[in-house]
């Protein structure tokens, strides 16, 4: 983790992986166990590895907690993403520079779900197919986009995977729903761009709250208070 000096919190430099209690890496292309079945699975972050997609907000929160950390707040996450220049993009500009971060791959008409399911219904099963994040030129290893960073030294906060934060929607018809920031590699900037990109989870099943929504695009990283080290 690195310290964000302006806000006095620590954050993982890279998107996280998940590990089982015995230290075995969880397959990053497959949905992790739900929190009630998850036990001591924990989060770690390294450069040059495949980050965990297919993860829900509560799964991510528990993995951070089991590692002695916590999910970042939206304010913390955006502060780390914007860097000391407080820019819209981590590399210090207020406009997108093509190729700096892993975004805008595969336009809607070429979405990888449609490649696998030409008559896609966009079901939970389809959106969590482990093959999606294994396509060439799709999900990248952590830190692969070496220019997708800032002076704090955090990578991939825009693109690659969108990342769950601790905050929930506070009002309106989606009150209590989970929030993911930063967009993902197939994101087209529909819900703002750069560090302002924001997606709100949907309730996709009456027995599972939005905090358990997950698909190929959802990942996370952890934060911590400096005094916890």
List each language-model region with its residue ranges:
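Structural recognition of the beta-strand scaffold that forms the well-ordered cores
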Residues: 10-12, 70-72, 88-90, 153-156, ...
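An exposed tryptophan-centered "aromatic clamp" motif
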Residues: 61, 77-119, 164-186
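Disulfide-stabilized, aromatic/cysteine-rich ligand-recognition loop
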Residues: 17-18, 50-58, 62, 68-72, ...
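Short, well-ordered junction/capping motifs at the entry into regular secondary structure
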Residues: 112-158
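Hydrophobic, well-ordered secondary-structure scaffolds
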Residues: 138, 144-146, 157-163, 167-169, ...
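Short aromatic-cysteine micro-motif
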Residues: 2-85, 96, 132-152
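Short beta-strand segments enriched in hydrophobic/aromatic residues
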Residues: 15, 165-169, 226
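Active-site beta-strand termini and strand-to-loop segments that position acidic
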Residues: 4, 157, 224-225
């Amino acid at each position: 983790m690195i310290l964000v000096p302006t806000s006095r919190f620590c954050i993982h430099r890279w998107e996280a992986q998940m590990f089982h209690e015995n230290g075995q890496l969880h397959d990053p292309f497959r949905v992790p166990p739900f929190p009630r079945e998850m036990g001591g699975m924990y989060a770690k972050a390294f450069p040059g590895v495949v980050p965990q997609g297919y993860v829900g907000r509560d799964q991510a929160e528990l993995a951070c907690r089991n590692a002695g950390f916590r999910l970042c707040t939206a304010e913390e996450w955006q502060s780390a993403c914007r860097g000391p220049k407080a820019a819209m993009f981590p590399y210090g500009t207020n406009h997108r520079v093509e190729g700096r971060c892993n975004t805008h791959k595969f336009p809607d008409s070429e979405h990888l779900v449609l490649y696998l399911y030409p008559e896609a219904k966009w079901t939970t099963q389809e959106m969590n197919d482990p093959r999606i994040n294994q396509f060439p030129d799709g999900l990248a290893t952590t830190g692969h986009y070496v220019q997708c960073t800032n002076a704090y030294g955090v990578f991939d906060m825009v693109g690659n995977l969108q990342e769950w934060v601790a905050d929930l929607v506070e009002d309106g018809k989606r009150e209590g729903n989970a929030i993911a920031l930063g967009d993902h590699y197939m994101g087209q900037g529909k819900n703002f761009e750069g560090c302002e990109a924001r997606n709100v989870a949907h309730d996709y099943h009456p027995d599972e709250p939005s905090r358990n929504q997950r698909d190929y695009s959802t990942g996370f990283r952890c934060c911590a208070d400096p005094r916890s080290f």
